[in-house]
From Swiss-Prot:
It holds the Pfam family AICARFT_IMPCHas. Disulfide bonds: none annotated. It comes from Neisseria meningitidis serogroup C / serotype 2a (strain ATCC 700532 / DSM 15464 / FAM18). It comes from the Bacteria. This is Bifunctional purine biosynthesis protein PurH. InterPro entries: AICAR_Tfase_dup_dom_sf, Cytidine_deaminase-like, MGS-like_dom, MGS-like_dom_sf, PurH-like. GO terms for biological process: 'de novo' IMP biosynthetic process. It catalyses: (6R)-10-formyltetrahydrofolate + 5-amino-1-(5-phospho-beta-D-ribosyl)imidazole-4-carboxamide = 5-formamido-1-(5-phospho-D-ribosyl)imidazole-4-carboxamide + (6S)-5,6,7,8-tetrahydrofolate; IMP + H2O = 5-formamido-1-(5-phospho-D-ribosyl)imidazole-4-carboxamide.
Amino acid sequence: MPSIKRALISLSDKTGAVEFAQTLTKLGVEILSTGGTAKLLADAGVPVIEVADYTGFPEMLDGRVKTLHPKIHGGILGRRDLDEHVAKMEEHGIGNIDLVCVNLYPFAATIAKPNCTLEDAIENIDIGGPTMVRSAAKNWKHVAIVTDTADFPAIAAELEANNGALSDKTRFNLSRKAFSHTAQYDGMISNYLTSLSDDVLSGEPEIGEFPSQFNQSWIKVQDMRYGENPHQRAAFYRDIDPAAGSLSAYKQLQGKELSYNNIADADAAWEAVKSFDAPACVIVKHANPCGVAVAADTLTAYKLAYVTDTTSAFGGIIAFNREVDGETVKQITDNQFMEVLMAPKFTAEALEIAAAKKNVRVLEVPLEAGANRFELKRVGGGLLVQTPDIHRLNRADLKVVSKRQPTEQEWNDLMFVWNVAKYVKSNAIVFGKGGQTYGIGAGQMSRVDSTRIAARKAQDANLDLNGACAASDAFFPFRDGVDVIAEQGIKAIIHPAGSMRDQEVFDAADEHGIAMVVTDVRHFRH
């Protein structure tokens, strides 16, 4: 492991650069730098040589040409183990550059600005940076490349412990990270440019929602024991730029390793529970809510959600959108077996009680507003991409199509069951009252079958549906679903309408004295 003698540091994100450069200086490393990075280091008293002085060639073209010079790239790419390379470098006065610390122009931050022009974006496409990164990464056996300032402390510690040298393992891992960095950067540029309309020369082009070539980067969080079934292999990846409040930000406080199905179900539970403003509990089984409730506190919300379907809740995922206390956890552990318990925070007492069930996975997830930019679904040889279903119902946009108007309580219940229905697999029917689900019918090919299942769930739970409300994630194709709902004593229905037989459905509601509200928004979930 030869010691590092010369480093080139050129950073957009300069976090920790001074401290790292000071460590290099103590180890006798000569530092080359450019522009703002050179000034930062010099102002901090770090000896630094400007790249222009080192190459004898000035920075030019508004900074577009700074490091694109044989003395830089020859010093990075030259193989120390090949006599021919060594001789050529000596012939042309090219010295070795053993360490390159580069991160790239902030392209993502630039295009995220609301008034970003195409010219702004183009000027923030880094050329020299990726070239140095790839050169150093390619020659990893002889050169170390650092693209993430978060790595500075670990690299500095290893250099100090090894007389200024880095191990082959470290250099190779840094190389892999560097190539991933430039791949993600180029993918981001491609996404932006291929999202633009073709009228580039006639003015500012419009930015479309979907690029003509779709690039995304993911970071592996863990290999899993198996996938959806034991014979399938699986891993969990995190979006390189995850949305705020995403499940991927979870912190596991106790329990066994999360399985593939745990993560899938936990995501369904978390997306549902964080959609409620009031304290809420969502219990999920096989990615479907089997009980949902809102209440004044987490304990009450859990009790109400649990009674919807105590059988299906067994082995489920339980999610809250408020801090969970010890009393709530005790009630849960007394009632049922669960796979995952999740909330934005737990009290010390809650964690102490949960610890008695050492296999239960307890997750803390930041409760922040946010949604993935895109939802992805693989099909054979392709990918379906759509924006997420984050529509929030506004009562002012709803239309009453029945003779009877909903009461104020029915309005509240309709809003609640409609929000639950959005997270239930289609065909979805949800019955509820007083902020509590009374019956959930999910995933049936026939809407009337989902309706019958929801009714049976309420009957099994001894929940009286008289005066309850119903939500359907899509229109009723026939009046039979309304007739079954009416048989249960339900007094108000919310659904999107849009069927050829809408009027028959509306008439059925009037025949039964049901208040019917239409949304003009559908919530299919497959």
